[in-house]
Amino acid sequence: MAVDKGRRPVPPERRAQGRKRAEPGDVTIRETRTRPVHTPEPEPELLAKDGILELEDDDDNDDDDDDDDDDKSNHHDGAPKNEDDMEAFPELVSGKDKDDDGDEDEEEDDEDEDEDASDDEAFDSDDLENWDEEADAKYGDADLSDDDDVKEGDAALERMIARARVKPDESERTTNKLGIDTGVAARFYDESRNDDGSKRGRVVQSHVTGMPKVEYPPIEPEYDSDSSTEDVPNRIGQVPLSWYDDLPHIGYDINGRRVLRPAQGDELDKFLDSVEGEGDGWFSAHDKTSGQDVKLTDEELDIIQRLERAQIPVEAYDPYEPATDWFTQHQQTTPLTARPEPKRRFVPSKWEHKKIMKIVRAIRQGRIVAHAPGRERPAFYNLWSDADEARADHPMHMPAPKLPLPSHVESYNPPAEYLFGDDEKAEWEAAEPEDRKLPFLPAKYAALRLVPGYDQALHERFQRCLDLYMAPRMRRKRLDIDDPDQLLPKLPAPRDLRPFPTHTDVVYAHAPWRIRTVSIDPSGAWLLTGPDDGHVRLWDAALGRCVATWDMNAGVARADRSPVYCVQWCPNRTFGIAAAVSVGRVTLLAPPQCGKTMYEASLAHLTTPHAAEDAATAQWTRASEADRAAGVCVRIDVRNNKHASLVPKYVRWHARGDYFATVSPEAAGEAVLIHQVSKHRSQAPFRRTRRAGNSAMAVQCVCFHPSRPWLFVATQRYVRVYDLVQQSLVKTLQPGVRWISSLDVHPSGDHVIIGSYDRRVLWFDLDLSERPYKALRYHSRAVRAVAYHPRFPLFASAADDGTVHVYHGTVYSDLLQNALLVPLKILRGHAVQDALGVLSIAWHPTLPWLVSAGADGDARLWTP
């Protein structure tokens, strides 16, 4: 057996001690060991021929660390159990590998020689056989002590390096219930359980997928159950517990049994609870509902500790979480579409210009002030000053209308007069639902508990919802006026405006014929009436005696006879002439009863001129000597272009008495004709007065201006003012009514009064507006006639309700002051026949007298 020269053999124990590497954190334990004494066995059985026994350095091969660990454990446990364990440590090198590893062995030998030159000495195999263990004991102990010092230094160095390499723990310090750090405190539960006492899961292989999975233990009621679903024994609700201060119980459970008050300990018991046991007294809170001390959980204690440290109660919440810009962190360089940019992207916006100009105008007007000082606020103010103020509603907020309050008929025990009889019940059932006054049948019950359910409740609630959703709402401003009389204008008393007609003085009877028209001559002594029998009657106005009668249908077939539609005296006092229209012609009368001088002047004025030969619209004819002696002077036959007779129904004189106009509503271009008495000539000033198929343009009446050459033409809905000299339209009055019935012009010429079939009387101020100045709605039926008094500030209106309304109307010369209109008197005396009342009225030319003609066949003179 060859042994490497220059090396000192080391016993197996020293070899094992030298190859052992100290681990970081290990604590070296020195102990005295007894070296085992044994008889060496023959070497040829262990080593091959020419084998070499080499001890490698600890730093040469890192793969031997695992073996070192095993030897280390054996070293600490004591002496090796057998010799095989001791001798298995060295590496056995065979002779055939010597050549291959020669260079490596030489390098290792050189290193070993340099390190152990002072310690190792060469000896041969005979020395190994004659090894003296006792002699080498002292030397071995000294060598072991040196090795222990080296290992202690290496272990300290390794610990320093390990501490330098470990990343510092930046997590917050956690403590248990007693305030001790959980890193150094003893665990209450073993490793198989979590800190809260629940069992930990274990990783097992799935039988289905074959993959590892976490298998959790079954839930234990003591640790894993949730107490949030447990029933609370005390079921008193949110009531003050002070109610039970003087009672032995603190409430009732779900079964209605009393929950007795638990025994309460004194201060000594509380102190003992906090000292003895596990210290649960420090982690308990008193529950007022149950009267017991409830132990707080770890989560609740953690929340309390976080609140004490002014931290967020939720541990998982991160207030400083880095914000991730999901939409703009990656710039998109590829466009979605290749469409060219529109022109509006390069042209200034028109709407932005308007908005900017709006702001500029506000700045110029001073509504927007740049750098305006803010409103000064007081340094000290009442914090709760506006706490009780109601919040302002939205500007467009309109509250829903409230439902009507229930009445006696909706009672379950209504009075007998509210109950329906058999006939009323049958009528209610036969009527449509929208025509019924009540949506239900009133019923009577002896007690409220006997009232059945209302079957229409859901339907009524649905209709209410429809009304709130579909019906538009309107806001009406209400005036906060204590005295309603403040709304009425300050008008003078009627007694201060006398004289005006108040009662009937004379009655002119025409029974059974209704009187369509009435007129008083300029002197006021004579009265003309036109009833339906076709005769014009002359009356003495003061006495009420009929003086003369003229038949307007003389020479006309019985089938063509017609009533007298209108009669009008000439306003010229020089002549006593009257015009009456009926059966398609106009008759000029000169009553001889008016006086011989006036009769002769009137007759000469009517019969001297000659009629025009080329008259196409009207034919003037002188009456016979007998007719002229009776008072009939001239007849005018009104014809159209086809020589068909027309029916004029209205006549009106000019203020000078030489012209008068007639109206035929059914005619077209010749509805209005102007006749000149001095020349016996008639003409149509309008070529077309009604459009084809438009009855609203039909002429109803006309009137001359008292001082200007103006003609007022009233159609169904409008009043047009024409200048006859300039042949132009001056203005159009817009009454806003459906059908105009009558028209009259004030003696001053600046005001117009209009009556309509929709029960309204309208006053117009021509200098003020084309709209009505006043609208009087005092009649209950259609207005038939209106008239101004020639001298007094009076005007009147007659309607089908059988009444005549007298008004006071003062017109001021000052244009800045409006007219004063005052209702004075309602004259009642005419009876309504066939829905017709008073058909015509006329004022006395010099006295405050009024004559009215009605459908009852009477004409009445009203005086003060």
Curated annotation (Swiss-Prot):
Biased composition (Basic and acidic residues): 1-52, 72-83
Repeat region (WD), residues: 509-549, 559-599, 694-732, 735-774, 778-817, 833-864
Segments passing through the bilayer: none
Keyword hit for Ligase: no
Gene Ontology, cellular component aspect: nucleoplasm; PeBoW complex; preribosome, large subunit precursor
Compartments, record wording: Nucleus, Nucleolus; Nucleus, Nucleoplasm
Acidic residues bias: start-end ranges: 53-71, 100-135
Gene Ontology molecular-function annotations: ribonucleoprotein complex binding
Alphabetical keyword list: Nucleus, Repeat, Ribosome biogenesis, rRNA processing, WD repeat
InterPro entries: BOP1/Erb1, BOP1_N_dom, WD40/YVTN_repeat-like_dom_sf, WD40_repeat_dom_sf, WD40_rpt
Top-level division of the source organism's lineage: Eukaryota
Gene3D superfamilies on file: YVTN repeat-like/Quinoprotein amine dehydrogenase (2.130.10.10)
Region: Disordered, residue numbers: 1-153, 191-231
BP GO annotations: maturation of 5.8S rRNA from tricistronic rRNA transcript (SSU-rRNA, 5.8S rRNA, LSU-rRNA); maturation of LSU-rRNA from tricistronic rRNA transcript (SSU-rRNA, 5.8S rRNA, LSU-rRNA)
Entry-linked PROSITE patterns: WD_REPEATS_1 (PS00678), WD_REPEATS_2 (PS50082), WD_REPEATS_REGION (PS50294)
Subunit and interaction comment: Component of the NOP7 complex, composed of ERB1, NOP7 and YTM1. The complex is held together by ERB1, which interacts with NOP7 via its N-terminal domain and with YTM1 via a high-affinity interaction between the seven-bladed beta-propeller domains of the 2 proteins. The NOP7 complex associates with the 66S pre-ribosome.
Functional note: Component of the NOP7 complex, which is required for maturation of the 25S and 5.8S ribosomal RNAs and formation of the 60S ribosome.
Similarity field: Belongs to the WD repeat BOP1/ERB1 family.
HAMAP family referenced in this protein's UniProt entry, alphabetically: BOP1
Protein name as catalogued: Ribosome biogenesis protein ERB1
Originating species: Malassezia globosa (strain ATCC MYA-4612 / CBS 7966)
